[in-house]
Amino acid sequence: MDISVYVASAFSKNNKGGNKAGVVLNEPTLTTTQKMAIAKQLGYAETAFLTESNCADFKLEYFTPKEEVALCGHATIGTFAILMHLNKIHKSRYTIETNSGVLTITIKEDTIFMEQNQPTFYDTIPANKLTGCFDLNLLNTNYPIQIVSTGLKDILIPVKSEADLYALEPNFEEVKKVSKHYEVVGMHLYTFNVDRIICRNFAPLYDINEEAATGTSNGALACYLYKNHYLRKENYVFEQGYSLHSPSEIFVNLVISNKDEIEKVYVGGKGYYCEMQELSLK
């Protein structure tokens, strides 16, 4: 059985870089095992499978080479970039059924925004619990290390400077152990000033040592920065992927209520069609 798979890059910067994902359109008969096999053959962090939905415009399922995950920001942006490439987008608002619920996609010109879940703030973690993961002297102790989710749980870890962020060498086996212990997808490391927020993301538990652009992690980080009054904006731009030579830009827009609470979280980015691959399934 041959399957056509699109490859898209999401969260690209100036039509370059970004994070690649596989996109499979309208193959409703594929089994979970086959979807996993496709994701593994492609070898990208995630592959999205789009089918019809009874409760939304589309149904999207996401597979890493190892297992199914509830949600994936860059694979969603990538899917809609492919639909735009195929001239199948005819309105500015769509709904998608995912294992994280029904979410809204908004398209503004060439930028695709994806609604996230409202933020959930979990435990803060003492730095010594990360011993062995990387050099703890590079961490910025002015800000708490915390687990936050807008769909997927990540440990948000502040680093002193951009130079320190790139100098940091993770021990992926230790990162994997800590991620498993705290039941998170991975670790999202960041440094920021008034003008820039720069990140790196490690998810070796899901066979992704480092990822060039992560939508859900930056959605969580925007909420963390806003709620704690560290950097208050309604529109954030996160930069990621430089250490992988794949510069990426992730936009996060927060909708804030009159009571100064985060009502909605939208993660957005640009994307482009890369190629099409034909895979053989046994």
Annotate each PLM feature.
Residues M1-L71, I77-K282:
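Active-site proximal loop and beta-alpha junction motif in alpha/beta enzyme cores
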